[in-house]
């Protein structure tokens, strides 16, 4: 029996192509503790999204597998919620209705209508979006759309929150505000979070561990960096923090080394 909350063991996956099998991942091993915040980082094509899709149950590994609380993951489930870079809100539904859709899917048989309403409002409040509850996606900014997308994911009460470059399309200020909100939510709720990012500073600021992927094809885990910065974290205080800058340099060194090997 595994003692890990979430465990990937010898995960490999290949996809059929006209030129034969494309090997995307080889022997990916990860042990993730409950309530940990993990970032996946690496160059484009290194299999970060593929790892996330396997954990989400949208892809099945060719060999190896995933265990969540010692149960095999082989299909999507409400205990794993995904937030994409594109908010993926349904354009004909209000913010409230977009969250309601997820809540009804998970809780229709276990919560009354009044309880579901309270739960929707609670999750919109978590991301400071109650003021936008009656607005359509076309009526709100990109940052607000992403907040609603996060509320929708949290409303499923997932054990694992999967985030695929959730702030990648946002301006720097909106991104910083959402990073701060995510740190507060993670501290309050204690979800296990796996986030894909290309932003080294974001990874160091948010994470307990940074998983650095080698270049694809046949990508795997190149190194794992434990981030031992005290929480709660303040971005302004960390700007001149020696330990923060050490971690940042370690990740950059790994990425630059991989880039040199690719072009050599």
Question: Can you annotate each of these PLM segments?
Answer:
Residues 41-43:
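The feature captures the beta-strand-to-loop junction immediately N-terminal to the Walker
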Residues 64-76, 112:
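Conserved ABC transporter NBD signature motif
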Residues 93-102:
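Short coil-to-helix segment of the ABC ATPase nucleotide-binding domain corresponding to the Q-loop/switch region
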Residues 104, 111-132, 184:
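Conserved ABC ATPase "signature" region
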Residues 135-138, 156:
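Conserved signature/switch motifs of ABC ATPase nucleotide-binding domains
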Residues 150:
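Hydrophobic anchor residue at the start of the ABC signature
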């Amino acid at each position: 029996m595994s003692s890990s909350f979430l465990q990937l063991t010898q995960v490999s996956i290949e996809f059929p192509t006209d030129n034969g099998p494309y090997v995307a991942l080889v022997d990916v091993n990860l042990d993730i503790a409950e309530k940990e915040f993990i970032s996946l980082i690496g160059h484009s094509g290194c299999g970060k999204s593929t790892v996330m899709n396997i954990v989400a149950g949208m892809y099945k590994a060719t060999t190896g597998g995933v265990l969540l609380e010692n149960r095999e993951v082989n299909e999507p489930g409400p205990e794993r919620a995904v937030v994409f870079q594109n908010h993926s809100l349904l354009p004909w539904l209000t913010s409230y209705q977009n969250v309601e859709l997820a809540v009804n899917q998970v809780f229709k048989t276990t919560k009354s209508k009044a309880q579901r309403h309270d739960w929707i409002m609670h999750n919109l409040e978590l991301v400071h979006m109650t003021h936008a509850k009656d607005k359509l996606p076309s009526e709100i900014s990109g940052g607000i759309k992403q907040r609603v997308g996060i509320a929708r994911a949290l409303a499923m009460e997932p054990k694992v929150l999967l985030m695929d470059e959730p702030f990648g399309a946002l301006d720097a200020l909106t991104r910083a505000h959402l990073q701060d909100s995510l740190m507060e939510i993670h501290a309050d709720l204690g979800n296990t979070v796996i986030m894909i990012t290309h932003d080294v500073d974001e990874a160091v600021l948010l994470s307990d561990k940074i998983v650095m992927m080698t270049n694809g094809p046949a990508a795997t885990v190149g190194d794992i960096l434990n981030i031992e910065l005290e929480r709660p974290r303040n971005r302004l205080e960390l700007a001149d923090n020696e330990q923060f800058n050490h971690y940042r340099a370690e990740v950059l060194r790994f990425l630059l080394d991989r880039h040199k090997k690719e072009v050599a």
